[in-house]
From Swiss-Prot:
DNA-binding region of this protein: 123-182
Region span, Disordered: 75-125, 259-289
The name this protein goes by in its record: Homeobox protein Nkx-2.6
Organism: Mus musculus
Function: Acts as a transcriptional activator. In conjunction with NKX2-5, may play a role in both pharyngeal and cardiac embryonic development.
One GO CC annotation: nucleus
Molecular function terms from GO: DNA-binding transcription activator activity, RNA polymerase II-specific; RNA polymerase II cis-regulatory region sequence-specific DNA binding
Tissue expression summary: Not detected in any neonate or adult tissues.
Any GO BP annotation: positive regulation of epithelial cell proliferation
Gene expressing this chain: Nkx2-6
Main location: nucleus
Family: Belongs to the NK-2 homeobox family.
Skewed-composition ranges (Polar residues): 261-274
């Protein structure tokens, strides 16, 4: 089978390399022509057919052509100006970026032909200083009345040789100051609570012995009451005396003294020691159900 001849395409490696070489050669030639015949950028015009920049200066004998890259290089490095090699320092020392920025803005304004813009700060109004007599009069009126009506403000301003606006602003500032003082006092009270109150507590026991004040002992004295019950003849007029002492008896103490009920014939533990007058005696032979 016969091999077909290899057709050269514009996308082959050789064509691409050849195209790059041609572009480099044309760029070098254009730069050489530009340095040989310097022409200002304003005399360049673009040929719409070829896409190249051509010189419109008829005084030039040799026309030249350049590319977009050449124009950009011309804008960054104008022809005829000495180029400072990188790494060198000028006699005036290091360049200050802030100074360069200011000089650039100034040159731009001058180039455009407009006036140089100078930023000036707005002038602040002078602060009104009140005399001591005026301050005392304003403080006295503020204690009497925190808010003033327009006629009252006008009258006070004329009396103190001030304007109504000055009096109005002074009262506003004074109200704000008093409000801030109240808030600060509230925060101080909340941050530092009041000291705890002392409460007097009576001492009941001291060194294992009861210790009562006379006033307390009067409330804990003996309780006496007379029994008004007269349904039984034997108990008529028998006083009931129950003494509640303030001292507590120990659990191991013996039985206390007999009460009048026990002495009358009733003991708290069981039957009476002897039958009473009108109560019939229980027969010994009768058993309980």
């Amino acid at each position: 089978m016969l091999s077909s001849p290899v057709a050269s395409t514009p996308f082959s490696v050789a064509d691409i390399l050849r195209l790059e070489c041609q572009q480099k050669d044309s760029k070098t030639l254009s730069q050489w022509e530009l340095h040989r015949n310097p022409v200002k950028p304003r005399y360049l015009r673009m040929n719409q057919e070829s896409g190249w920049f051509e010189s419109s200066d008829r005084a030039q004998a040799v026309p030249f052509r350049c590319t977009w890259e050449t124009v950009l290089e011309m804008g960054s490095n104008p022809v005829g100006e000495p180029q400072t090699p990188p790494g060198t320092i000028s006699r005036l020392g290091a360049r200050n970026p802030m100074t360069d920025r200011g000089v650039g803005n100034l040159s731009g304004d001058m180039r455009r032909g407009g006036p140089v813009s100078t930023r000036t700060r707005p002038q602040r109004k002078s602060r009104v200083l009140f005399s001591q007599a005026q301050v005392l009069a304003l403080e006295r009126r503020f204690k009497q009345q925190r808010y003033l009506t327009a006629p009252e403000r006008e009258h006070l301003a004329s009396a103190l040789q001030l304007t109504s606006t000055q009096v109005k602003i002074w009262f506003q500032n004074r109200r704000y100051k008093s409000k801030s003082q109240r808030q600060d006092q509230t925060l101080e009270l909340a941050g530092h609570p009041l000291a705890p109150r002392r409460v007097a507590v009576p001492v009941l026991v001291l060194d294992g012995k009861p210790c009562l004040d006379p006033d307390v002992a009067a409330f804990l004295g003996p309780y006496k009451a007379t029994s008004p019950y007269s349904c039984f003849g034997g108990y008529a007029g028998t006083p009931y005396d129950a003494s509640y002492a303030s001292r507590c008896t120990s659990a191991s103490a013996g039985p206390g003294p007999l009460t009048p009920l026990a002495s009358s014939g009733f003991s708290p533990g069981g039957q009476s020691a002897a039958p009473q007058g009108h109560l019939p005696a229980t027969p010994q032979g009768v058993t309980a159900w």
